[in-house]
């Protein structure tokens, strides 16, 4: 059974390219364009990993991460934060609230695939 990834970003071009790339790698994919939709998709799609943009409408990636980490049933869910703000304080905040990894935009798609496969144990 293929691993499931939820892509959460409000930039359509990023969503389209990530969705294409991850499907090509054999992952099952769902997408959400804001934080509220992300939380609903986690409940219905039950992903193994979330690629979560930090800056989004309705709920930020930080708020989504905090909500998921507060839910014991989501303890095994891997969260990778995506951001254009690569400042140390942003990275530290993301990791402190429970993100498993942090990727700064722009990123190498090849490196991202390697990172996700390693995290999901399918490398």
Region spans (language model):
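Two-component/phosphorelay signaling modules centered on CheY-like receiver
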Residues: 12-30, 119
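The feature encodes the CheY-like receiver
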Residues: 15, 56-58, 87, 105-106
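Acidic, metal-coordinating helix/loop segments flanking the phosphotransfer/catalytic sites
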Residues: 31-49
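Hydrophobic residue at a beta-alpha junction
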Residues: 32-33, 58-59, 68, 97
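C-terminal output helix
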Residues: 107-117
């Amino acid at each position: 059974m293929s691993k499931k990834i939820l892509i959460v970003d409000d930039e359509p071009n990023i969503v389209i390219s990530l969705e294409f790339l991850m499907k090509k790698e054999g992952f099952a994919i769902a997408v959400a364009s804001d934080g509220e939709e992300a939380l609903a998709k986690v409940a219905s799609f039950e992903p193994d990993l979330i690629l979560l943009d930090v800056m989004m409408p309705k709920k930020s990636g930080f708020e989504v991460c905090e909500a998921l980490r507060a839910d014991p049933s989501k303890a095994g869910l891997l969260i990778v934060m995506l951001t254009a703000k690569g400042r140390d304080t942003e990275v530290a905040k993301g990791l402190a609230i429970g993100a498993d990894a942090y990727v700064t935009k722009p990123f190498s798609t090849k490196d991202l695939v390697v990172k996700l496969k390693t995290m999901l144990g399918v490398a």
